[in-house]
A protein has these predicted regions:
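CE4/NodB-like, metal-dependent polysaccharide N-deacetylase domain
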Residues: 234-274, 366-373
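Active-site-adjacent pocket scaffolds in enzyme catalytic domains
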Residues: 31, 273-373
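Glycine- and acidic
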Residues: 17-27, 176-181, 230-244, 264-268, ...
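Short, solvent-exposed turn/loop segments enriched in Gly/Ser/Thr/Pro and often Arg
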Residues: 55-60, 213-216, 269-278, 298
């Protein structure tokens, strides 16, 4: 059975940069870059008959460039570069609190040394500032912790392609400062590959890139915060109305300019921040130059005043109206609208990563088959 499917992968990170210090307070742009952002399009390249759309949020793209071109760092990266012999008590506490920020079943427990440190973190925390206390971490433990935290975030593809990363992953413990530095430097190198990888996706692989307003604002509320009562009648609003449609348009325009500066052309497609749309939002999207937009089925359900009824398997009982494209004619032009299947999206985004790969694929194909039957 041959079916038509649209896959849209949303890549987003909000701004994490502290404007006063110039340092990023969280590491997620860097860590997700080495985990997903390069690996996904490379994996999909192995299946040239399947087309994908990637939504790249401008705030993510700007931060990637900042790391790669300006040498920006986050506080996790800066601390990771420090020799474990020179750590302060506060830094040790920070490491124990934050350097197990990974999904244990797949990113911590499979690596014996990381699992050992994970299990011992509470005792190590109690021993801080108490020389000789049972369970305390020394320089070797902290060096291993910093190295393994950064190493586990690499997608297995990157570890397999890099002999040194592969060796370090197999080594598992007893890391040197030089080995730790290699891991950190390799992260920045992979970050530099993100934008070229997606440029290749559009130029050679037949994929498409879409985008989002510059700083990921909720456009309907930025245009007029009274729009909240359209979705939630009776919602309590500030006494002073808030309406800045000019700013909303500027967010769209600047986002498109950021995109064009990196990829050489403007995006045709828009994934509005958090999927939030309204008639005024669609009009501004058309005015900015977008030709299509995608959002969630719940908005279509509200617009048509029709509930999305599903059977026990999660299959919509009335699929035709949900899986149809829609056309919105606005004073500024036409925008074609597509609405995602919320159930399938949640399976891909939140459930299948916990499943056996074959079982996840079979379940997804079963869902698609049931929908088309």
């Amino acid at each position: 059975m041959k079916v038509s499917l649209c896959f849209l992968w949303h890549m987003h990170q909000p701004h994490y940069k502290d404007p006063e210090t110039g340092t990023y307070i969280l590491p997620w742009v860097r860590l997700h870059a080495v985990k997903d952002y390069v690996a996904l399009p490379r994996i999909f390249r192995q299946f040239p008959s399947v087309r994908h759309t990637f939504n790249l949020v401008p705030s993510l793209l700007v931060q990637l460039q900042d790391y790669v071109e300006n040498g920006a760092e986050d506080i996790y990266l800066t601390l990771s570069r420090k020799n474990a012999l020179d750590l302060t008590r506060d830094e040790e506490e920070f490491l124990l609190k934050n350097f197990f920020s990974a999904f244990p079943p797949t990113m911590i427990l499979p690596q014996p040394r990381y699992a050992e440190l994970f299990m011992g973190q509470d005792a190590a925390r109690r021993a801080i500032g108490k020389p000789g206390a049972t369970g305390g971490f020394g320089a070797s433990e902290y060096t291993d912790l910093m190295t393994l935290f950064n190493l586990t975030w690499f997608h297995p593809m990157h570890r397999d392609e890099d002999d040194e990363l592969s060796r370090l992953w197999r080594k598992g413990r007893g890391y040197t400062e030089r080995e730790k530095a290699y891991v950190l430097d390799r992260q920045i190198e992979i970050m530099s590959e993100v934008i070229p990888e997606y440029r290749r996706l559009t130029e050679k692989d037949g994929g498409e890139l879409s985008s989002t307003p510059l700083n990921h604002p909720i456009l309907p509320l930025l245009i007029d915060n009274r729009a909240a009562q359209d979705a939630h009648p009776g919602a309590v609003l500030p006494k002073m109305p808030f309406a800045y449609p000019e700013d909303a348009l500027e967010q769209l325009v600047r986002g498109r300019e950021t995109f064009r500066s990196l990829f050489g052309s403007y995006p045709s497609g828009l994934w509005p921040s958090e999927g939030s749309i309204s008639p005024a939002t669609i009009d501004l999207a058309a005015r900015a130059g977008f030709k299509w937009a995608a959002t969630d089925e719940v908005l279509l359900s509200k617009a048509l005043k029709k509930p999305v009824l599903r059977d026990a398997e999660g299959v919509p009982l009335e699929p035709n109206w949900l899986y149809s494209p829609y056309r919105a004619d606005t004073p500024s032009g036409t925008v074609h609208l597509f609405f995602r299947d919320h159930h399938l999206s949640d399976l891909i985004g939140f459930e299948y990563s916990r499943w056996d790969a074959v079982e996840a694929v079979n379940n997804f194909l079963k869902n698609i088959s049931l929908i088309y039957d």
